[in-house]
Amino acid sequence: MHLELRHHAGGMPVLCVHRCVIVICVHGVVCFVNIFSADRVFLVVQMSIHPFVGFADGASRSTRNLSSAAWVIYDPAGELINLQGVCLGRTTNNIAEYSAVLELLTEAVNLGIRELLVYLDSQLVVLQLNGHSSVRNPSILHLYLRIRLLERNFDYITYQHIPRHLNTLTDAVANLVLERHLRNL
């Protein structure tokens, strides 16, 4: 995965993440996020009121029942300001997905972020966090309620589903964390 910051016509900085995301900024405010693969643009989001963008992902290895969580935050200038991952130990993939959102929101609060657009590749988590599906699992409900408490720190927060192949940076970090942990066992 490679990151680079380019300046295009009009001096607009564009953060290029190979085969993942382009964030275009005008006067320090994120205007568009283009998620793409090869030559096809899959998603264009107008974001004049959402200066910060976060991506979250959980990963698990069924053979070892190990899971990890990863999250990425871009600032209003389109700069990658936070990229982290953590091994969660033995847990389920759904708990890993929720843990990634929880860690992302915790970091955003610590950074003083008040408006956030969150992208996830887990449709179930997006449906539940947007109130379109209920949470029944007690372990997940605990994480869900912690996320709801953290949301009180934001003036605006929303969750959007993206296909798995468009969440490549956080997926790569989550899998790298798992691989490093497995090598150290």
Residue ranges and their predicted role:
Residues A9, V17-V21, V26-G28, V33:
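Short hydrophobic alpha-helical segments enriched in small aliphatic residues
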Residues A59-T63, L102-A174, R180-L182:
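RNase H catalytic domain
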